[in-house]
């Protein structure tokens, strides 16, 4: 049954200060980022409330609180607006005006038994220069990335999701070196079981310290022995906000520029931020290319090893002659030849990653050309295998997630060994074991291969390919959300223009 967050649009004033405090705390339930202060002045009770990291605290103190509390006048809304002429003063009477104002960086003042709240704009515009992501390349869409400042990261999330329905729970982890963690989700959307599971794992974490969100992920994921990531890590605020709006849970950590997103599925690691901004008939083929690239990266080199070692009869005659000529002076069997080149590729990749950006790119390109040419001329490897190795390496780069790309690259090594020992049977055995492992995996207790297993036909158009936006009126059924409807299907139908 579809549920929506309901908020009163009526004038709830006048109120007692304690009643207003209870009302605001109920609206910002489980969010520790609401500051609500009570003062008494000239026998009148005054409340000042705002979201701390959305405003400039020095300006609030100097331009608002000091004149307000040091004055000897008897305050009223009119007196405040006249005494503190900051040009942004307004009166709000309804909750559906006050709550968005708080999220937009306004400071609210309420005098007990008045008929309205006085609002001033103190938005914190002096933000740290947000830079681009280091591990996630963005072609279309916002380029900014998270920083090491938890306050800045929360500020960005609040700006992207401007609703009091956004719950931000404060949790502290680490006994010897405590770190602040924020559990973020939408109260009217996220599955309560998922939220409780994540909260329990964080609260029960009994460790001395946690250095980063990537380390935190290894403590709280479902299967720490698996090579595959079960939580999505991202440096992009828009990806995090989009996941929260889909009903997922995000975790931000102090001094960490990455967010954790759960639950995640195997297919979600092949979704790029560009998919959201591109047209469906452009995004779907690109997503299909990523899936095919993953398969090519895992099996292409093992297929070469198996065919040349055991099943050369399946190779076309002309190609077989070329392979024979290229391998004429190679003293090693194909399996050792492939493992050697794969290891060289990984060494060049790792060396390029540890060097400065421009130097690392040069080392990767020049080193690959030099090592490949020298290996062929020395008779250590064949030039045809270099082509297969290069295609496999390029295919692994198409994975938008760095963790998933690393997992795919590492899978090639056992697959090459199996192909060198058992041929095509070894490859099939390796793929079967891989599928069985993926079928057993979960993320926050939910199937990792959803919506393929268990099959959810309604979710296929969101996980494997994309349909036009006006066809995606439902959220993921497999997440068991409180509200599965994104928008009214009837209102999404095409309407005639006015002049038709």
Per-segment meaning from a language model:
Residues 278, 282-285, 326, 352, ...:
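Membrane-interfacial loop-to-transmembrane-helix junctions in polytopic alpha-helical membrane proteins
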Residues 1-299, 314-317, 438-500:
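Membrane-embedded alpha-helical signal segments
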Residues 283, 321-333:
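Short aromatic-rich membrane-water interface segments that cap or initiate transmembrane helices
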């Amino acid at each position: 049954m579809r549920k929506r967050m309901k908020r009163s649009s009526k004038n709830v004033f006048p109120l007692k200060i304690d009643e207003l405090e209870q009302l605001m705390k109920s609206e910002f339930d489980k969010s520790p980022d609401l500051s609500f202060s009570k003062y008494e002045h000239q026998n009148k009770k005054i409340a000042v409330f705002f979201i701390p990291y959305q405003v400039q605290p020095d300006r609030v103190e100097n331009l608002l609180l000091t004149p307000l509390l040091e004055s000897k006048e008897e305050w009223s809304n009119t007196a405040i607006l006249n005494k503190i002429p900051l040009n942004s003063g307004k009166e709000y009477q309804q909750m559906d005006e006050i709550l968005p104002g708080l999220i937009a960086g306004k400071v609210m003042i309420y005098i007990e038994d008045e008929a309205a709240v006085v609002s001033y704009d103190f938005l914190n515009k002096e933000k740290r220069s947000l830079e681009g992501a280091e591990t996630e390349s963005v072609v279309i869409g916002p380029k900014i990335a998270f920083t090491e400042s938890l306050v800045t990261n929360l500020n960005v999330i609040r700006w992207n999701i401007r609703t009091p329905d956004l719950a931000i729970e404060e949790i502290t982890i680490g006994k010897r070196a405590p770190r602040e963690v924020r559990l973020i989700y939408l109260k009217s959307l996220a599955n309560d079981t998922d939220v409780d599971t994540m909260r329990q794992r964080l609260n029960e974490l009994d460790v001395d310290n946690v250095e980063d969100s990537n380390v935190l992920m290894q403590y709280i994921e479902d299967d720490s022995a698996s090579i595959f990531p079960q939580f999505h890590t991202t440096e992009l605020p828009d990806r995090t906000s989009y996941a929260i709006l889909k009903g997922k849970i995000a975790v931000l950590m102090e001094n960490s520029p990455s967010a954790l997103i759960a639950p995640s599925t195997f297919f979600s690691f092949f979704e790029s931020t560009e998919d959201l901004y591109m047209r469906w008939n452009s995004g779907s083929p690109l997503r299909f290319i990523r899936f095919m690239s993953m398969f090519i990266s895992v099996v292409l080199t093992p297929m070469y090893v198996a065919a040349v070692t055991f099943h050369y009869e399946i190779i076309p005659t002309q190609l077989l002659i070329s392979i024979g000529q290229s391998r004429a002076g190679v003293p090693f069997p194909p399996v050792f030849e492939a493992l050697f080149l794969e290891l060289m590729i990984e060494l060049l990749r790792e060396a390029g990653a540890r060097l400065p950006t421009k130097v690392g790119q040069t080392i990767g390109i020049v080193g690959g050309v030099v090592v490949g040419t020298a290996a062929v001329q020395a008779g250590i490897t064949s030039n045809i295998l270099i082509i297969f190795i290069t295609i496999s390496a390029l295919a692994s780069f198409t994975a938008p997630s760095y963790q998933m790309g690393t997992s795919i690259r590492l899978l090639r090594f056992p697959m090459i060994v199996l192909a060198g020992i058992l041929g095509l049977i070894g490859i099939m055995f390796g793929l079967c074991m891989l599928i069985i492992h993926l079928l057993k995996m979960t993320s926050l207790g939910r199937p990792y291969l959803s919506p393929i297993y268990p099959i959810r036909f309604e979710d296929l158009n969101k996980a494997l390919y994309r349909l036009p936006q006006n066809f995606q009126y439902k959220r993921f059924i497999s997440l068991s959300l409180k509200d599965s409807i994104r928008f009214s299907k009837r209102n999404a139908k095409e309407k005639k223009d006015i002049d038709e």
